[in-house]
Amino acid sequence: MLVGIVGKPNVGKSTFFKAATLAEAEIANYPFVTIKPNEGVAYLKVPDVAKEFGKTSNPRSGYVLKQFRFIPFKLIDVAGLVPGAHEGKGMGNQFLDDLRQADVLIHVIDLSGSTNEKGESAALGSYDPAEDVKFLETELDLWYLGILNKGWQKFARTVIQEKQDICIALALQLSGLHVTENMVIEAIEELQLNKEKPHYWQEENLKSLAALLRKKTKPMIIAGNKMDLPPASEKLQSLKQQFPNYVFIGCSAEGELALREASKAALIEYIPGENNFTILKEVNLNEKQKQALSFIKTAILGRFGQTGVQQILNAAVFELLRYMAVFPGGANKLEDKDGHTLPDCFLMPPESTALDFAYKIHTDLGQNFIRAIDVRTKRAVGKDHPLKQLDIFEIVAGR
């Protein structure tokens, strides 16, 4: 599972990435700062389920802060897009191609309207960020259309001549974009296309199909950055009305980055996504740091309740992708052979079953599956039992 961060230059995309991963991404105020894609590890925030049993988890990967557990996932920051990227302008083809593997996109925009369409600094409030939403939709749709259009007539004729199923054939052709057969079936039905005569499909049909498959394979959440600047609140409400099908969440990437760096330096105690922090030793702070932390506490946390960065990460994976955090554990003992409590956590796709979970843990457990036991209720369930968020299961398997 891969999350991609997209957006034009200078909207705070690299700052968001660094805040989410605390990796060393180069951050500067000009286009093409991140020529090569930056990959990093970000974290999802969930309750530490071991607390329900009076214990604390010992994650093999990720970490625990007080009552929360942070689960790692892969995040990629692709260099800033510019209009015409699908035609290769800027380094568009490379950027879009890097996003091919992404399962969900976080589109960072400048809510303050102080970055123009080229990613250049502009007067506060002078640019409408709605244009950025439309622009990225257009670039991605044209990218998908370009892939779909490539040799379309020959492809369509071959499907007919060889009596192939167009849904299977299209899914195979577009598998690099994570298009599945079911997605193609749904899209063709929704657009009422004649699946028996794909060679009669018109350009407009292909455009609609490309756009629909893009929405299905690259769901997108909009991160409205610089939410603390004057025009941002008004812009955010306007965007929600203009694009009711998108999830918009305001954020301050700079605020989150400052808090995480201060926490890493042991200047403050801060749990990502919370509405407060504690200064550990005020004597260690210089005047500039005191002012910055005071501003974040008042103008960001006090006003909005959080910086928004953690909320966006969680929403991208748990709401848009509908993935679930599921834990393997013993019905009578949460510790592994080394004494670690609930060391593992797996992110499972929607509609996963107990059998899917067994295979995720180990192939042998899946192949020899007998039953799963819900650690909370001690109830045994079969292989088709649907998983839900924060489940804890023991897998019972034969030899």
Tell me the role of every PLM-derived stretch.
Residues I370-P386:
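Short acidic beta-strand-loop surface patches of small beta-rich interaction domains
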Residues E351-D364:
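Short amphipathic, charge-patterned alpha-helical segments
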Residues I147, R157, M220-I221, M227-G330:
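Canonical P-loop GTPase G-domain recognition
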Residues M1-Q161, L170-L174, K215, P219:
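Conserved G1/Walker A P-loop phosphate-binding module
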Residues T158-S238, A325, G330:
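Non-catalytic, charge-rich alpha-helical accessory subdomains
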Residues A397-R399:
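Short, charged beta-turn/beta-strand-edge "cap" motif at the junction between a beta-strand
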Residues L390-D391:
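Loop/turn positions that initiate beta-strands
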Residues D338-T353:
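Short, contiguous acidic and Ser/Thr-rich linear segments
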